[in-house]
């Protein structure tokens, strides 16, 4: 067993092409290798174990590196690990780190740095928003540690020497190596944390093991990173600098793109028809494992009443929002997007009915709950500051006022304070977006489990939890999908959230940017793969 796995994996790694900034022969490069990226807003953190959203993850993917990375086709490739063995029927992994790995300050990176990072993730003292991620990966004792029932040192990960990391799972997880590409499972510098403790993640203290290091952070304007000469593959990293711009308005991003000040930006909805005509070679529409929805807070009335939640769920014109208000989106009826591997979406007949019938159903539910024209439903709709999110919020509030007579107040915040408010439960109905951290429906559905850190609405359903727990025991994708479909039916019936649309990657990319991934549905962009052609 050991020999067969080892030989297969050695062959896999040795056959893997050299991906880092694979510049085609005879391609002239620009003298200034700087990539300027519209990243929407400032990240909430750059601490790998505390990352919870793509805004931060995009930067952390450049500053740090895990055991593996995801190539432009969405396939797992060796990163800090040069190879690995899968043993005991998929319950034990042995990762062999590359020789000579260093942190950006020149200190050696060892397997113990991975152990520390993973232990930090599950340690309740860290308060990682992704602590449950290791439990979802079924790493031994992770769930017990997160629940405060076991010590962090009992986590199923250990360094058998400086270059060898052994991971023990409670059960086989077919997509386990894919999960390793998310920042929660990145290493952290043991020597820096020993010196600075929780302050290690302040910019003046941080060190990095990724292709870039933090150079400058102008709050709410931009973050600049420069090439890391200590990176394991620095000789193949072409970019010298990356700028992550905090442009929270798609029109501003578009205007700066047209002015030549941004190389990659999101597309404003109202400009899509014109862009398709004027810049067809620069508009990129890439399938993406993303779901946009609104979360109810079940700890606050009126949304502790399923009848009220269902009334709002039924009266959303998803087609209008996805294709008219925003454009190029797909109306969502399930939390899990149809692009997820092996998932077949469930069709709900009630959402296929004419809006007039759905409104009648919704009004009946509200009447049962005690709401009518003399006592209208009142609530607050909460979203983070961004013009496209505002368009969606306005459309939703208008629909609910039109169909149900609801009085909806809009509330918006900057990204960081928005995240803090959601975590504190300071909302009634709030916007949420989820991008898969691995290609399986459980990446989406697990966010609603009773013990999930992402379940900010505090919905609890024992039947739902049992279905997902049962699904983790099944390796057959078809049988697992049947359980996922049952879970989606419960979401439809209980409405802890309202699916709105599925969003592909819709961006403008300058034609002189080379190496950009066009087929990775998880939207992992590694700047080490990019280069700027002469233009």
Swiss-Prot record:
Belongs to the bacterial solute-binding protein 5 family. Residues 1-20 form the signal peptide. It holds the Pfam family SBP_bac_5. Probably part of a deoxycholate transport system. Its expression in the presence of deoxycholate in a ygiS deletion mutant increases intracellular deoxycholate levels and decreases cell growth; higher expression in the presence of deoxycholate inhibits cell growth completely. Bile acid detergents such as deoxycholate are important for host defense against bacterial growth in the gall bladder and duodenum. SUPFAM superfamilies: Periplasmic binding protein-like II. Disruption phenotype: Cells grow better in the presence of the bile acid deoxycholate. Increased membrane stability when incubated for 2 hours in the presence of 4.5% deoxycholate. Increased cell survival in the presence of 20% deoxycholate. CDD domains: PBP2_OppA. PANTHER family: PERIPLASMIC BINDING COMPONENT OF ABC TRANSPORTER (PTHR30290), PERIPLASMIC OLIGOPEPTIDE-BINDING PROTEIN-RELATED (PTHR30290:SF10). One of its GO terms (biological process) is bile acid and bile salt transport. Keywords: Periplasm, Signal, Transport. GO terms for molecular function: peptide transmembrane transporter activity. The gene is ygiS. This is Probable deoxycholate-binding periplasmic protein YgiS. It comes from the Bacteria. GO terms for cellular component: ATP-binding cassette (ABC) transporter complex; outer membrane-bounded periplasmic space. It is found in: Periplasm. Induction: Repressed by the toxin-antitoxin system MqsR-MqsA; this mRNA is degraded by mRNA interferase MqsR.
């Amino acid at each position: 067993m050991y020999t067969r796995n080892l030989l297969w994996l050695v062959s896999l790694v040795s056959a893997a092409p050299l991906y880092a900034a694979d510049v085609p022969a005879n391609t002239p490069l620009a003298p200034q290798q700087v990539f300027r990226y519209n990243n929407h807003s400032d990240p909430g953190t750059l601490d790998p174990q505390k990352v919870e959203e793509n805004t931060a993850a995009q930067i952390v993917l450049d500053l740090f590196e895990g055991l593996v990375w995801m190539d432009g086709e969405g396939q797992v490739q060796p990163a800090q690990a040069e190879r690995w063995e899968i043993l005991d029927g998929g319950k034990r992994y042995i990762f062999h780190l590359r020789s000579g790995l260093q942190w950006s300050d020149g200190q050696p990176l060892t397997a113990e740095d991975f152990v520390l990072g993973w232990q930090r993730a599950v340690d309740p003292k860290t308060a990682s928003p992704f602590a449950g991620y290791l439990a979802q990966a079924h790493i031994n004792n992770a769930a017990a540690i997160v629940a405060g029932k076991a010590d962090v040192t009992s986590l199923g990960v250990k360094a058998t020497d400086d270059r060898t990391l052994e991971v023990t799972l409670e059960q086989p997880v077919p997509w386990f190596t894919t999960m390793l590409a998310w920042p929660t499972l990145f290493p952290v510098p043991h020597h820096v944390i020993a010196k600075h403790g929780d302050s290690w993640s302040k910019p003046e203290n941080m060190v990095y093991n990724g292709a870039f290091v933090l150079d400058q952070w102008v709050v709410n304007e931009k973050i600049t990173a420069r090439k890391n000469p200590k990176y394991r593959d620095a000789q193949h990293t072409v970019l010298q600098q990356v700028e992550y711009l905090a442009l929270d308005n798609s029109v501003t991003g578009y205007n700066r793109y047209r002015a030549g000040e941004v190389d990659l930006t999101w597309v404003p909805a109202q400009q899509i028809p014109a862009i398709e005509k004027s810049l067809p070679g620069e508009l990129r529409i890439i399938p993406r494992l993303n779901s946009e929805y609104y979360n109810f807070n079940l700890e606050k009335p009126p949304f502790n009443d399923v009848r009220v939640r269902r009334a709002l769920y039924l009266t959303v014109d998803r087609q209008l929002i996805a294709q008219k208000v925003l454009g190029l989106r797909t109306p969502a009826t399930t939390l899990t997007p149809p692009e997820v591997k092996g998932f077949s979406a469930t069709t709900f007949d009630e959402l296929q009915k004419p809006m007039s019938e759905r409104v009648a159903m919704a009004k009946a539910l509200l009447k049962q709950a005690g709401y009518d024209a003399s006592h209208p439903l009142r609530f607050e709709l909460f979203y983070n500051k961004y013009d496209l999110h505002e368009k969606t919020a306005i459309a939703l509030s208008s629909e609910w006022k039109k169909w149900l007579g609801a009085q909806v107040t809009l509330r918006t915040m900057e990204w960081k304070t928005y995240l803090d408010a959601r975590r504190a439960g300071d909302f009634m109905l709030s916007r949420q977006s989820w991008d898969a951290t691995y290609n399986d429906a459980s990446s989406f559905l697990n966010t609603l489990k009773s013990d999930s850190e992402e379940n900010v609405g505090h919905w609890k359903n024992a039947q739902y939890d049992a279905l997902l727990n049962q699904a983790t025991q099944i390796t057959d994708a078809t049988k697992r999908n049947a359980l996922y479909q049952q879970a989606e039916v419960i979401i439809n019936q209980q409405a802890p959230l309202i699916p709105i649309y599925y969003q592909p990657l819709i961006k403008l990319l300058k034609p002189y940017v080379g190496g950009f991934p066009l087929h990775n549905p998880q939207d992992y962009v590694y700047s080490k793969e990019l280069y700027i052609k002469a233009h």
